Amino acid sequence: MAVKIRLTRMGSKKKPFYRINVADSRAPRDGRFIETVGTYNPLVTENQVTLKEDRILEWLGNGAQPSDTVRNILSKAGIMQKFHEAKYSKK
């Protein structure tokens, strides 16, 4: 099962709000998911983001692939840097 970390659109028309979910890559965008690991609100001036850092690092360690947008969000939060340091410091 290929697992992705991606955005699920919530909110109403013209007022999007996103949940950052871990889901099977074959599931529809707003369909079945495994776990919610954060939220993203692009309408707030500072792009409000909440993340469960420990769960995201665990999923990345288990092989989950983030989408391009989620990868950018995680990079700005510093989570991708922590993941790469943990992954390559073992060797």
From Swiss-Prot:
Cellular component, GO annotation: cytoplasm; small ribosomal subunit
Keywords: Ribonucleoprotein, Ribosomal protein
SUPFAM superfamilies: Ribosomal protein S16
Positions of transmembrane segments: none
One annotated GO biological process: translation
Gene3D superfamilies: 3.30.1320.10
MF-aspect GO terms: structural constituent of ribosome
Family: Belongs to the bacterial ribosomal protein bS16 family.
NCBIfam families recorded: S16
Descriptive protein name: Small ribosomal subunit protein bS16
Source species taxonomy: Bacteria, Bacillati, Bacillota, Bacilli, Lactobacillales
